[in-house]
Amino acid sequence: MEVREKKDEKMEMTRRKSSALDHHRLPPYTYSQTANKEKPTTKRNGSDPDPDPDLDTNPISISHAPRSYARPQTTSPGKARYRECQKNHAASSGGHVVDGCGEFMSSGEEGTVESLLCAACDCHRSFHRKEIDGLFVVNFNSFGHSQRPLGSRHVSPIMMSFGGGGGCAAESSTEDLNKFHQSFSGYGVDQFHHYQPKKRFRTKFNEEQKEKMMEFAEKIGWRMTKLEDDEVNRFCREIKVKRQVFKVWMHNNKQAAKKKDL
């Protein structure tokens, strides 16, 4: 009897201990949730085989706009024109004398050495004022290669006149510098008197040639175009005048003829 009672007491104590342990133990699902929350969220090598569904693991993509290395388009430069000649023929003596040529006229075909020389004034194209679609371009070559000596008197530019304008003269020529010398004789400037203009061959025209050239120039509008090359060449052979000489004559007489029409 006593042995049985002790056995029952022992079983009762074991049952109570087991009940006490079950009271302090957490439920299975609660433990698993707590364990998942305590897992570290750091990723290795940018990947995680079992990501936490509660956390937003979608990567943020940042895209850069493609960089363009193409050069910006620029407007093509306009056609260059060469206007009045600005060569200083008295630069070596400290004066300022221009020849009065109003526009560059090529002496030869494009691509040749003669194409860079003006048929009217025989100066290089670089001495003429360059103009691109109305823009003024400063040409430093036109101011001469020598500087004005210190202490010299300021001299206003003098223009050498071209003959043959208006059909009054019988030839297309450049006047000498007599007026230039006379204008400075009163100031005692003797250093300019040694300047001598270079001699150029001048073509003389008779009255019949001048009349025919005037009529033909008005017919073609005082300009030569490629469409009229054959007609111009035939006319020049007829009056026995070179094509380039006729071109220079039109250049020198164009403005005077237009003034007469007005």
UniProtKB/Swiss-Prot annotation:
Expressed in seedlings, roots, leaves, stems, flowers and inflorescence. PROSITE patterns: ZF_HD_DIMER. The keyword DNA-binding applies. The keyword Zinc applies. Residues 198-261 bind DNA. Signal peptide: none annotated. A zinc finger (ZF-HD dimerization-type) spans 82-131. The record marks 250 as: Required for DNA-binding. It is found in: Nucleus. One of its GO terms (molecular function) is zinc ion binding. One of its GO terms (cellular component) is nucleus. It comes from the Eukaryota. Residues 1-25, 36-47 have a biased composition (Basic and acidic residues). Keywords: DNA-binding, Homeobox, Metal-binding, Nucleus, Transcription, Transcription regulation, Zinc, Zinc-finger. Its main location: nucleus. InterPro entries: Homeodomain-like_sf, Homeodomain_ZF_HD, ZF_HD_homeobox_Cys/His_dimer. Residues 1-93 are annotated as: Disordered. Pfam families: ZF-HD_dimer. Homo- and heterodimer with other ZFHD proteins. Interacts with MIF1 and MIF3; these interactions prevent nuclear localization and DNA-binding to inhibit transcription regulation activity. Binds to ZHD1, ZHD2, ZHD10 and ZHD11. Putative transcription factor. The homeodomain differs form the typical one by having namely 4 instead of 3 extra amino acids inserted in the loop between helix 1 and helix 2. PANTHER family: ZINC-FINGER HOMEODOMAIN PROTEIN 2, ZINC-FINGER HOMEODOMAIN PROTEIN 6. This is Zinc-finger homeodomain protein 6. It comes from Arabidopsis thaliana (Mouse-ear cress).
